[in-house]
Swiss-Prot record:
This is Cytotoxin najalgesin. GO terms for biological process: killing of cells of another organism. Expressed by the venom gland. Keywords: Cardiotoxin, Cytolysis, Disulfide bond, Membrane, Secreted, Target cell membrane, Target membrane, Toxin. The lineage of its organism: Eukaryota, Metazoa, Chordata, Craniata, Vertebrata. Disulfide bonds join C3-C21. Analgesic toxin that is blocked by atropine and naloxone, suggesting the involvement of cholinergic and opioidergic mechanisms in its antinociceptive effect. Shows cytolytic activity by forming pore in lipid membranes. It is found in: Secreted; Target cell membrane. One of its GO terms (molecular function) is toxin activity. Belongs to the three-finger toxin family. Short-chain subfamily. Type IA cytotoxin sub-subfamily. The keyword Nucleotide-binding does not apply. It comes from the Eukaryota. Monomer. One of its GO terms (cellular component) is extracellular region.
Length: 30
């Protein structure tokens, strides 16, 4: 599954790239 940086709940479901998904989410939220 690809992490959707537009959905804050979705990055939590990313098992391998949790930190990466979180960073992408934060960057898109800047």
């Amino acid at each position: 599954l690809k992490c959707n940086k537009l959905v804050p709940l979705f990055y939590k479901t990313c098992p391998a790239g949790k930190n990466l998904c979180y960073k992408m989410f934060m960057v898109s939220n800047k």
